[in-house]
């Protein structure tokens, strides 16, 4: 994840917008009291996938990406989630192939891609472009067949439009991935999601980032909801030995639904 203004902490793979940042988006013209649709007209439909067969992936997993290039992947690990991009859309994590090879040795895995909105052009076309590019980068690294993709939605990414435009970009990305035959989830936090995407509630699985903290605090956040879903995965940033890493665990209510959150062996 990329660093931006104020105290945005970049630790581990996805990282976390640790400080409360003021929203850089607006939800429509000033003075209006109406509640506009959370998506622009013509936005694609995002489907809520049927449940996968019962599966579990107990224990702590890790997400890694370009910040961990050249470093040994964490073990033991219950599962691994690897970033395709190099901190921004339309860029490559140059260690993706090696890092995903690590994830394939684990009982479950997934990938994530960076989201943003440039503020110019068609939000739907822009979102679809980001997905097409990410899939091409995945294949260029010799990786294919990953069935679970997460959209990284953070204030540290570029958001140069309204919440309605932002949400439409995200809808286009999710729908494009679903058309490619994969399952989709949202990585964010309740605060960040509200500031970026407003009231849009697609009902996709969500991965809740609490930032620096403890496992106990992360598990306590499992009841939090955003984007129309209760937290399925939680992430906390902490030391593992001498290293600071993004730790992740499946929430208790989802303990037998690992297949809805990860690509389970």
How would you label these PLM feature ranges?
Residues 1-7:
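N-terminal export and membrane-targeting signals
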Residues 12-43:
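C-terminal region of N-terminal signal peptides and the immediate post-cleavage residues
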Residues 39-74, 201-265:
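Functionally critical loop-and-helix segments that line ligand-binding/catalytic clefts
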Residues 48-182:
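Substrate-binding cleft of extracellular glycoside hydrolase catalytic domains
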Residues 67, 115, 190-192, 239:
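Short, solvent-exposed coil/turn elements at secondary-structure transition points
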Residues 126, 192-203:
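Glycine-rich, charge-decorated loop segments at or immediately adjacent to ligand/cofactor-binding or catalytic sites
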Residues 177-195, 208:
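Aromatic-lined carbohydrate-recognition surfaces of secreted/lumenal glycan-active proteins
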């Amino acid at each position: 994840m990329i660093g931006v203004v104020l105290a945005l902490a970049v630790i581990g793979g996805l990282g976390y917008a640790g400080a409360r940042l003021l929203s850089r988006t607006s939800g429509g013209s000033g003075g209006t009291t109406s509640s506009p649709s959370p998506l622009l007209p013509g936005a694609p439909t995002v489907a809520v996938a049927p449940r996968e067969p019962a599966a579990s992936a107990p224990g702590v997993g890790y997400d890694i990406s370009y910040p961990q290039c050249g470093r040994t992947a964490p073990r033991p690990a219950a599962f691994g989630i690897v970033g395709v991009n190099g901190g921004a859309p339309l860029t490559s994590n140059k260690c993706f192939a090696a890092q995903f090879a690590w994830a394939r040795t684990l009982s479950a895995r997934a990938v994530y891609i960076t989201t943003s909105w440039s503020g110019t052009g068609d939000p739907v076309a822009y979102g679809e472009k980001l997905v097409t590019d990410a899939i091409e980068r995945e294949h260029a690294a010799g990786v294919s067949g990953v069935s679970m993709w997460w959209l990284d939605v953070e204030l540290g990414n570029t958001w140069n439009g309204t919440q309605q435009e932002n949400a439409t970009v995200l809808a286009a990305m999710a729908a494009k991935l679903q058309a490619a035959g994969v399952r989709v989830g949202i990585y964010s936090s309740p605060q960040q999601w509200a500031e970026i995407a407003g009231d849009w509630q697609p009902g996709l699985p969500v991965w809740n980032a609490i930032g620096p903290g403890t496992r106990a605090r992360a598990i306590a956040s499992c009841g939090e909801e955003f984007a129309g879903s209760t937290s399925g995965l939680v992430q906390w940033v902490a030391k593992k030995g001498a290293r600071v890493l993004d730790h992740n665990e499946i929430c208790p209510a989802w303990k037998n639904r690992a297949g809805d959150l990860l690509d389970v062996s």
